[in-house]
Every structure is written in structure tokens, then in C-alpha cells.
Amino acid sequence: MIQTEEMNQLKADALADISQAADEKALQDVKVKYLGKKGSVSGLMKQMKDLSNEEKPKFGQAVNEVRQAIESAIADRKSVLEQDRLNKQLEEETIDVTLPSRSIKLGATHPLTRTIQEIEDLFLGLGFEIVNGYEVEQDYYNFEALNLPKSHPARDMQDTFYITEETLLRTHTSPVQARTLEKRNGQGPVKIICPGKVYRRDSDDATHSHQFTQIEGLVVAENIKMSDLKGTLELVAKKLFGEEREIRLRPSYFPFTEPSVEVDVSCFKCGGKGCNVCKQTGWIEILGAGMVHPNVLEMAGFDSSKYTGFAFGMGPDRIAMLKYGIEDIRYFYTNDVRFLDQFKAVEDRGEA
């Protein structure tokens, strides 16, 4: 029978080897050496067959105590080695939080979006309310409520996308004005702008699109005059195109305003002397406007003898083309990164 001293020596040797294991692989080798099928502890168990029945229990208990001590020491050492490995990994992967971060490539505000926001901010500063409406609209609000009955010849001026006989894609944002007036139950004042997409059956080319944006404005109150319209539009022109700009009003025709005017701004490129932008005229057309037709007020429940108003409509697409020298409206809608990247520089410089 193996002596107790020798068994204790085996245990001491195993514990020494475990404590000296430098990594998890070395520890695994120690485990195999002592606890494997051909290991030292397994070799002790083979001696059981040579012992008497009285000796076997005590011997087996002693061997199990050695095995448990070795297993416990291996588990403790493994935990230490795993923590050391983790600490080393963390040390190697330490991030210096004082270093500058990697730059992220940022886009820029779309030139059309920037123009719309600029116009909206301008009118908000003048006390206007922004009102949105339906893009799929009823024929009544798109035409009839705006002094365009079904038999009116001016309907031919706008080729329309009809969904059903009485439902269509709006051809302007004027239906928002009609609905707003109707909701006010004949009580002023009303001071709104209506931005949004509109649709017409145009053939797409450099200056036309079947879908484009429009911003219309409406003011209805007592004693509103043509001079109020002119003063408002002069301010808008100066804010959008420069303080030195002037405007001129030319007689025109719109079914929902009377009188109606086309509004031109003095050319911001040549200062009115004549160039390719203004086609040598010194003036650039920017919007249409006029005094709200009494029929429109009456159909919405307003007393036209008490209330008057003015309305105007502008195309942000055209204004953006003029401001940024864009020659083709289709550039706004094709999402060409080469085109859009140009406006990142404009935004970085803080230009409008």
C-alpha cells in the first residue's frame, strides 16, 4: 500500500505544477498529467485491487481527497488565468477617449427644402400660419370653390390628373385656402401660407415637371387693399433676392382673384441692365397674385362687402433655380449625389 507521505507528496507536486501553469494550455496539460485516464491519480486507483476489503474504503477516501484538492486548485487557477487574459486584452484594446473621433460624412439640406424653409420662416416672421392640406383633393375644392365651375373655360389652363370624376391630384395648393375659409365660418382675419406638392399633366423638361412644389398665401380681413399686397411682396422679394431688389406688377388673369397681377423682380444678376438670366429684360417673373375674388369669399361664407383679401402663389422650384443658378428642374428630383454635394459647401459657408 502506498504510504500517506507519498500521497501527500503527489498532492504537493500537483498543487505546485498548477500554481506554476502560465496559461490555460499549460493548466490543461497539468490536469491531464494528474487527472487524466493515465494520470497519477488514476494510477493510484488501480492499486485498489491489491488491497484488502478493510483497507479499500480508507484508501479510496484518501485518493478522492487528493483528487478534489487538485480539481479545486485547477478551478481556482483557471479563474485567475481567465481574468489575467481578460485584463491583458482590455489593456491592449484600451481606447483613448481624448483622441478625436472619426469624421462622419454628412449630407446637406436639399436646395429645394432649404428654399421652402427659408420662405416659411419669412412668412412666419410676418405672422402667417402654415396650413397643410390634401394632395388627393375633391374637384369642388380644387376648382368650384375657387370660382372655377365645371363649365368655366379656364379649367383648360390646367391639365389635371383625375382619379375619379370628382377626385383628382390637386393642381395647386389653393384648395387648402378654400377649406380654411370654409372652416372659419365667415369670420376673419385669415393669414395663412399653404406649402406642398402639386401635380399637373406636363411633359417633363428642363423647366416643367408633372410634380412640383408650390407655396400659396392668403390674407382676408377688413380693409385689405392692393397696397397691402404690394408691400408684402416687396418685402418678400428683398428677403429672398437681396435688399436692392425692386418689383413690378403686370396685369394678368386668374379666376380666383380680381384684379390679378404677375409679379416680377429686378434681375439680381445684372441689376436690371439685361442678361441671359432675365432674357435681356432686366426683370424676372417670380409669382402670381391678386385681390381675392368676391365670389370666392361668398362661397366660403364671408361677406364680401365687409371682408377683402389678397392671395399669391409662388413656385419654390423656380425660386431655387434662380437663386442657385440651376438650369434643369429635374435635378431636384433625380437624387444625383454629384448635384446634391455642391450644396454641402453652400451650407458650410452659411449661405442661404
From Swiss-Prot:
Name of the protein: Phenylalanine--tRNA ligase alpha subunit
GO CC annotation, single: cytoplasm
Positions of Mg(2+) binding: E258
Cofactor(s) recorded in Swiss-Prot or TrEMBL: Mg(2+)
PROSITE patterns recorded: AA_TRNA_LIGASE_II (PS50862)
EC number: 6.1.1.20
Single annotated GO MF: tRNA binding
InterPro entries: aa-tRNA-synth_II, aa-tRNA-synth_II/BPL/LPL, Phe-tRNA-synth_IIc_asu, Phe-tRNA_ligase_II_N, Phe_tRNA_ligase_alpha1_bac, Phenylalanyl-tRNA_Synthase, tRNA-bd_arm
Gene name as annotated: pheS
Root EC class: ligase
GO biological process, one term: phenylalanyl-tRNA aminoacylation
UniProt source species: Staphylococcus carnosus (strain TM300)
